[in-house]
């Protein structure tokens, strides 16, 4: 595929793709009412991991597909992510001898998703038993399908389920996988591949997710320094010795899927092409969509169906304020800029039901002291020598708990912002965002209030407007518990998930360390997210459904465009992308069963 195919492309004004003899289309009577500029079997809205997976599966079934992307670059939030997939009983785990079954995984999902949700209609509809079973059944097949075509995955060793003490959990890992390192030269774009796939600012190393915890605590032990050296040497060897452009995580995920897409000659991904509205018959059958291109609006006929997988509404301030908890700020999200709810709004306009619109993949988020951008604080808060407090100076959560739970607790406590308070022991051992161990905070970060520093706790409390006596009392109690290694208040450090992001050199509890060594630091934390998790209701076939449970014929959805099968929880690393790609896979299989 030439570089120009990934840039601004207009749609042809003719119908270049004939209706294939083996495909039953929706009938010419309905289409006579509409003039279409382009035809395809399946229109896929969104070029993230779900959309590209759907395109590959379409080709497998002999169906043509057209992927449209509103932004100039492809990949969406998938390209920003760690690239992990949570897929119970996945083939890599089976090959590694890890014991898991669909029944055990179902027990786990029921334990963590359905607890205390008897009155929660949204969870019961979004995470129905048939949808859970569909995910668990088809997830391993989706992974095998991609591997058979050349996609390189690897296990994320030791990454536990996020609720390792729940029934059915795998405390030592096995359900999370991620992309292997990929040579972006294979895309044929040279150094310009960065113009095709969405990038975060700054240069990245070929780092795997399971190495990140060690790399960011490089000041704690020589073993962690060794991990840093291994990553650096990997990058030097692959780039300078072998002449590769090595990428990992979300960039590898999207790049590998794009590369496979290119091998099949499925046609280009049309960038700068935004969904405007779905086109339906008077009876509500979806015929295609109206889209905006650099050359004006065009209509696309989707003979077999439309798949919406264009993300959620993380950057839509109006929708966030309408549906979600407040205060809300679209700037706090880690999702891609184009994540503004277009696909969800389009679905609602043709009768789709919604659920979980008040939810997101929450997590405490800070302003990076070096780069100034919002940063999802995954590891910093789990480390010893720090606490999170509200304005009264009181702790209100297990700081190392799963991030979506932490976001829920922050809103429940009305702690917006909350404050992450830590000392020099934390500062000299661990990175905080892009601020490396022992690195002094930039003056502009101190001036802007991204980070605060003081020689005493009392002075720090006055700087950040937190109750002085409350904070001193909290730290006195916390330090006693840290010395004993037992958090009697919130059980921090008692689960394998907590320990995964802790510091194994700190004993007796790798997540607890007293906050008593000056200087002291504080960083404001807001309830950011990795994207929203509410959206269109879908069934076990990924069909979009109405309030009465009937499907909107010809309309499918996957990923953050839908109400998540994970309900209000986050069961394990990759619980966003795993279901997104699986339900995109399911959608295409169902379309094929209806039309091929």
Swiss-Prot record:
Q: What pathway, per the record?
A: Mycotoxin biosynthesis
Instruction: Give the Enzyme Commission number.
Output: 1.3.-.-
By its UniProt entry, which Gene3D superfamilies does this protein fall under?
Answer: FAD/NAD(P)-binding domain (3.50.50.60)
Name the positions where FAD binds.
28-31, 46-47, 53-55, 410-411
**InterPro entries registered for this protein in UniProt:** FAD-dep_OxRdtase_2_FAD-bd, FAD-oxidoreductase_2, FAD/NAD-bd_sf, Succ_DH/fumarate_Rdtase_cat_sf
An annotated GO cellular component of this protein is:
cytoplasm
Q: Which GO terms describe its molecular function?
A: oxidoreductase activity
Q: Which UniProt keywords apply?
A: FAD, Flavoprotein, Oxidoreductase
Answer whether the UniProt record assigns the keyword Nucleus to this protein: no
Alphabetically, which GO biological process terms does the record hold?
A: helvolic acid biosynthetic process; secondary metabolic process
Cofactor section:
FAD
Please tell me which top-level EC class this enzyme sits in.
oxidoreductase
Q: What this chain does, per the record?
A: 3-ketosteroid 1-dehydrogenase; part of the gene cluster that mediates the biosynthesis of helvolic acid, an antibacterial nortriterpenoid. Protostadienol synthase helA cyclizes (3S)-oxidosqualene to (17Z)-protosta-17(20),24-dien-3-beta-ol (protostadienol). The synthesis of protostadienol is followed by several steps of monooxygenation, dehydrogenation, and acyl transfer to yield the final helvolic acid.
- What family does this chain come from, according to its entry? Belongs to the FAD-dependent oxidoreductase 2 family. 3-oxosteroid dehydrogenase subfamily.
Q: What is this protein called?
A: 3-ketosteroid 1-dehydrogenase helE
Gene encoding the protein: helE
């Amino acid at each position: 595929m030439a570089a120009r195919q990934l840039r601004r492309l207009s749609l042809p004004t003719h119908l270049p793709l004939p209706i294939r003899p083996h495909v039953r289309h929706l009938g010419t009577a309905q289409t006579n009412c509409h003039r279409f500029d382009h035809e395809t079997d399946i229109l896929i809205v969104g070029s993230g991991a779900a959309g590209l997976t759907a395109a590959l599966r379409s080709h497998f079934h002999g169906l043509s597909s057209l992927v449209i992307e509103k932004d100039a670059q492809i990949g969406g939030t998938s390209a920003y992510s760690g690239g992990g997939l949570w897929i119970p009983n996945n083939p890599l785990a089976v090959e590694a001898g890890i014991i898991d079954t669909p029944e055990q995984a179902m027990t786990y999902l029921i334990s963590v998703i359905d607890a205390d949700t008897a009155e929660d209609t949204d969870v019961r509809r979004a995470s129905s038993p048939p949808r859970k079973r569909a995910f668990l059944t088809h997830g391993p097949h989706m992974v095998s399908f991609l591997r058979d075509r050349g996609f390189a995955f690897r296990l994320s060793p030791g990454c536990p389920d996020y609720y390792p003490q729940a029934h059915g959990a795998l405390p030592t890992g096995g359900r999370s996988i991620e992309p292997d390192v990929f040579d972006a030269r294979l895309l044929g774009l040279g150094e310009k591949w960065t113009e095709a796939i969405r990038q975060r600012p700054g240069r990245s190393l070929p780092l795997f997710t399971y190495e990140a915890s060690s790399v960011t605590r490089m000041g704690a032990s020589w073993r962690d320094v060794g991990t840093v050296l291994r990553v650096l040497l990997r990058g030097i060897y692959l780039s300078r010795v072998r002449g590769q452009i090595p990428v990992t995580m979300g960039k590898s995920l999207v790049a590998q899927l794009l590369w496979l897409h290119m091998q099949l000659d499925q046609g280009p991904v049309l960038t700068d092409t935004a969904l405007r509205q779905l086109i339906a018959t008077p009876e509500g059958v979806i015929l295609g969509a109206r889209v905006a291109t650099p050359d004006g609006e065009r209509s696309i006929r989707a003979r077999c169906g439309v798949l919406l997988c264009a993300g959620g509404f993380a950057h839509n301030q109006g929708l966030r304020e309408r549906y979600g908890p407040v205060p809300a700020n679209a700037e706090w999200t880690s999702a891609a800029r184009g994540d503004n709810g277009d696909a969800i709004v389009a679905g609602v306009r043709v009768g789709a039901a919604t659920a979980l619109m008040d939810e997101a993949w929450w997590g405490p988020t800070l302003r990076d002291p070096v780069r100034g951008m919002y940063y999802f604080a995954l590891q910093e808060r789990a480390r010893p020598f720090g606490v999170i407090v509200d304005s009264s100076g009181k702790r209100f959560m297990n700081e190392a708990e799963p991030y979506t739970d932490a976001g829920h607790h922050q809103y429940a406590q009305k702690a917006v912002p909350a404050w992450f308070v830590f000392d020099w022991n934390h500062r000299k051992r661990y990175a905080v965002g892009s601020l490396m161990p022992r690195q002094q905070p930039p003056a502009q970060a101190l001036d802007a209030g991204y980070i605060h520093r003081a020689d005493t706790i009392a002075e720090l409390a006055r700087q950040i407007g937190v109750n002085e006596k409350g904070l001193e009392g909290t730290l006195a109690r916390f330090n006693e518990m840290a010395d004993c290694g037992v958090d009697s208040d919130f059980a921090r450090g008692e689960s394998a998930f907590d320990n995964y992001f802790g510091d194994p050199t700190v004993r007796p509890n790798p997540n607890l360390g007293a906050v008593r060594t000056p200087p002291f630091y504080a960083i404001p934390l807001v309830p950011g997210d990795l994207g929203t998790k509410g959206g269109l209701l879908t069934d076990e076939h990924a069909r979009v459904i109405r309030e009465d449970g009937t499907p909107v014929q010809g309309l499918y959805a996957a990923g953050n465009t839908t109400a998540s099968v994970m309900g209000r929880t986050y069961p394990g690393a990759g619980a966003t992308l795993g279901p997104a790609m699986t339900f995109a896979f399911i959608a295409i299989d169902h379309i094929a069963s209806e039309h091929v």
